[in-house]
Amino acid sequence: MEIRNREEQKPFTTKDGSTIRSFLDLTNSPVKEQSLAEATLPEGGSTERHYHKLSEELYYLLEGRGVMEIDGQTQEVGPGDAVLIPAGAWHEIKATKAMRFLCCCAPPYAHEDTYFE
């Protein structure tokens, strides 16, 4: 059985600029098909526009507000919103109010699968 507590996961900054606490991923558990992490962005912060060749992502907004951009389309997002980011889609999220959200990737997140403009 694999159980990870949020407080035991050390935050780090990913290649896209968000701060992450990785709950279950290739580095800390025997996951094979997906990964789960919590991301935070300060008010006014954003991820760098990027895409993943292999991973489909799901974001689930817990706190804050922002603007999600996927392949040139933008929409305001907030608590309770779930966002699908298809593999290969350029995307970026900007925090208009400090944000906290869950990220699920399938296959699991890997730095090597993150590409920038």
What residue spans do the PLM features occupy?
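Conserved short histidine dyad/triad with adjacent acidic residue
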Residues: 37-53
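A short, N-terminal "cap"/entry segment at the start of jelly-roll beta-barrel domains
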Residues: 1-33, 48, 114-117
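Glycine- and acidic-residue-biased ligand/ion/polar-headgroup-sensing regions
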Residues: 54-56, 60-66
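Short acidic-glycine-tyrosine-enriched beta hairpin
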Residues: 72-87
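Histidine-centered metal-chelating micro-motifs
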Residues: 46-48, 83, 87-92
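A cytosolic small-molecule/anion-sensing beta-strand core signal
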Residues: 62-63, 78-79, 97
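Ligand-binding loop in jelly-roll beta-barrel domains
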Residues: 87-111
